[in-house]
Every structure is written in C-alpha cells, then in structure tokens.
C-alpha cells in the first residue's frame, strides 16, 4: 500500500475518531456517516476502518497506556489531541508492522494539521516517552 494512502487513512481516522468522541454515537454509525459524506479518494479504506474500529474498541486500554506520560489529566486533553494520541497508541500497540518512528512522525504531522499551535510538541513528547514501554524498539 502506498504511504500516501495510509497517511490519508490516518487523517480520515482522526476526523472520524474526533466525531465519535464528541457524539458518543455507535462506531459503525460514525464510520458509515463519515464514508458517505467525506471525500475518501486516495484513502486506504481498510486501514481507515482498522484504525477507527481499533481505537473505539480499545479506547480505555489506550487511554490507560498513555496516562503515565501525560503532563495533565486525560480529561483535560483537547478532543483533537486525544484522537491523535489514541490513534498513535493504537498503531504502537497493535501494528508492529508500522515502525514506531513512523507512528510518532505521522501523529506529529496530524497534530500540525488538525491541532492547536503547539499540540504537535505535546504529542511528540507523550509518544516519545510512551513508545519504549508500549513497543520495544
């Protein structure tokens, strides 16, 4: 699969995870609505689905895994930061075929696109600390 298709899958997944976090709707409904309303040309749809459903199913586990590395309470995170961190923690935890440096870099790039001004620095700091524990380098 082309790296660009995976990057687009991550971008779409972060948006859908964000929507799910805010709405509280069933993940299948969020997925269906997202795919019917958004431009998904050039997106690795299978990877998008894996990320979205994987994060939803494992959200509590992912949150618990990242909590020791947060400089503030999980509840104080912005929803965009939380969506990006959950996605990256999912990749670090469940997708060993994705090099940890790629997972971290992709999360930083997502934070630059979707996050507040310095959220990419926060995301980088959390993931740099979490990666050695979550996945043996």
UniProtKB/Swiss-Prot annotation:
It comes from the Bacteria. The keyword Phosphoprotein does not apply. Belongs to the NusB family. Pfam families: NusB. GO terms for biological process: DNA-templated transcription termination; transcription antitermination. SUPFAM superfamilies: NusB-like. One of its GO terms (molecular function) is RNA binding. GO terms for cellular component: cytosol. This is Transcription antitermination protein NusB. Keywords: RNA-binding, Transcription, Transcription antitermination, Transcription regulation. InterPro entries: NusB-like_sf, NusB_fam, NusB_RsmB_TIM44. NCBIfam families: nusB. Involved in transcription antitermination. Required for transcription of ribosomal RNA (rRNA) genes. Binds specifically to the boxA antiterminator sequence of the ribosomal RNA (rrn) operons.
């Amino acid at each position: 699969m082309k790296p660009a298709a995976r990057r687009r899958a991550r971008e779409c997944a972060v948006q859908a995870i964000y929507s799910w976090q805010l709405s509280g709707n069933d993940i299948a409904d969020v997925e269906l609505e997202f795919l019917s309303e958004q431009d998904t040309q050039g997106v690795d749809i299978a990877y998008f689905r894996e990320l979205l459903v994987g994060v939803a199913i494992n959200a509590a586990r992912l949150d618990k895994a990242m909590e020791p590395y947060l400089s503030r309470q999980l509840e104080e995170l912005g929803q965009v930061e939380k969506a990006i961190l959950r996605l990256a923690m999912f990749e670090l935890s469940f997708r060993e075929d994705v090099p940890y440096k790629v997972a971290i870099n992709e999360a930083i790039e997502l934070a630059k696109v979707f996050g507040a001004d310095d959220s990419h620095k926060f995301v980088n700091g959390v993931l740099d600390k979490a990666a050695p524990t979550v996945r043996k380098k």
